[in-house]
Amino acid sequence: GMSGSCTVKTCWMRLPSFRSVGDALKDRFDGASRVMVSNTDLEAPTQRNDAAPHRAPRRERYKLKLQPHNPDHKSPGSKDLVYLEPSPGFCEKNPRLGIPGTHGRACNDTSIGVDGCDLMCCGRGYRTETMFVVERCNCTF
């Protein structure tokens, strides 16, 4: 027979962890392709005289054709990250772009991160400085 109880299952979308999103973005960033915009297929959106405004879908609004900067590379896919110009170098000072450069900055010679000497000094080499610091430890015996 019938009973007065029932089971309900509810499903919902859940975001992945911040770490996994960051890792995926970093992978795409590392594999980004330099492209050129080909204006041979460029078309301005068509104007309509309807009373109701018409917007073409974003993908079709401007038919930009992205071609790889290097002709030996394949064209980027819809999920690939692309860039038009390389980033400026941050190793050398560039006042016009507000880049102070990395000369004279303190680095950590044991780190493999962005504060590490190998990365921060851009392969120029670096001087090490050993310091002995005496501090009071307020120890009690």
UniProtKB/Swiss-Prot annotation:
Q: Please report the PTM annotation for this entry.
A: Palmitoleoylated by porcupine. The lipid group functions as a sorting signal, targeting the ligand to polarized vesicles that transport wg to unique sites at the cell surface. Depalmitoleoylated by notum, leading to inhibit Wnt signaling pathway.
The record's Pfam families line, in alphabetical order, gives:
wnt (PF00110)
The question of whether Lipoprotein is a record keyword is answered with yes
- Which GO terms of the molecular function aspect are on file? cytokine activity; frizzled binding
Q: Name one GO biological process term.
A: segment polarity determination
Biased-composition ranges, Polar residues, are: 40-49
Q: Where in the cell is it found?
A: Secreted, Extracellular space, Extracellular matrix
Chain positions carrying an annotated carbohydrate: 108, 138
**Predominant cellular place of this UniProt entry's protein:** secreted
Instruction: Identify where the record puts lipid attachment of type O-palmitoleoyl serine.
Output: 3
Which Cys-Cys disulphide bridges does the record give? 107-122
**Record-linked InterPro entries:** Wnt (IPR005817), Wnt_C (IPR043158)
Q: Provide a GO CC annotation, any one.
A: extracellular space
Which parts of this chain are annotated as the region Disordered? 40-61
Swiss-Prot/TrEMBL keywords: Developmental protein, Disulfide bond, Extracellular matrix, Glycoprotein, Lipoprotein, Secreted, Segmentation polarity protein, Wnt signaling pathway
Similarity-based family:
Belongs to the Wnt family.
Question: Briefly, what is this protein's role?
Answer: Segment polarity protein. Binds to the frizzled seven-transmembrane receptors. This protein is probably a growth factor.
* PANTHER family xref list: PROTO-ONCOGENE WNT-1 (PTHR12027:SF91), WNT RELATED (PTHR12027)
Name of the protein: Protein wingless
* Organism phylogeny: Eukaryota, Metazoa, Ecdysozoa, Arthropoda, Hexapoda
